[in-house]
Regions:
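Hydrophobic adenine-recognition pocket in adenosine-nucleotide-binding enzymes
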Residues: 1, 84-86, 119
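Conserved GNAT acetyl-CoA-binding A-motif
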Residues: 107-120
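Conserved acetyl-CoA-binding loop-helix of GNAT-fold acetyltransferases
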Residues: 83-86, 92-109, 126, 130-131
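A short beta-loop-alpha structural element at the N-terminal edge
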Residues: 1-11
Length: 166
């Protein structure tokens, strides 16, 4: 995600708010509450502020981002908390899965050991988070706190020595 696109995080955070079927969505001003502003205010200034974007043409249509913050999904001072959102018309197409996997790969390369998030229990995204390896480590009456341990990939490395593939 380009620095000039960080301004979209506030709007995307609003899109990440789960609204149960039949409930009215909250006003957009809800994103200005202090407990939600920590997700986007000053983004890019923290040591583990990272964001990836899905773009359609020149429009950012979704993002996954993380940072060290004392938020709903806070585990400890070394575990970044993650947020993910797509505009509704882009959901269900695998974009969120790809963004999450790309973020996990990027964090692994940086040596990050784990990442957390909070999600409303009724949010269909719970299935997505489980599918990419998050597990529930704590819960409240309304939400799950989930954690994904980021393990170094074990791979097979091939070397080309004197024209021989070993």
């Amino acid at each position: 995600m380009r620095v000039e696109e960080y301004a979209t995080l506030k709007d995307l955070l609003y899109e990440a708010i789960y609204v149960p079927p039949g409930d009215a969505p909250p006003p957009r001003s809800v994103a200005d509450r202090p407990e939600l502003r920590v997700y986007f205010q000053g983004f890019g200034s923290g040591p583990l502020d990272r964001a990836l974007a899905a773009v359609d043409g020149s429009r950012v249509v979704g993002s996954v981002w993380c940072r060290l913050m004392d938020d709903y999904g806070h585990i400890d001072d070394e575990t970044p908390s993650l947020a993910a959102a797509l505009y509704p018309e882009y959901r269900g197409q695998g974009i969120g899965t790809e963004l999450l996997r790309a973020m996990m790969d990027a964090l692994e390369r940086e040596g990050v050991r784990q990442v957390s998030l909070s999600v409303q229990k009724g949010n269909p995204a719970v299935r997505l988070y489980r599918r990419v390896g998050f597990r529930i480590v704590r819960e409240t009456a309304e939400e799950y706190i989930m954690l994904k341990e980021i393990e170094e990939a074990v791979g097979i490395y091939l070397e080309l020595l004197d024209g021989l593939l070993i």
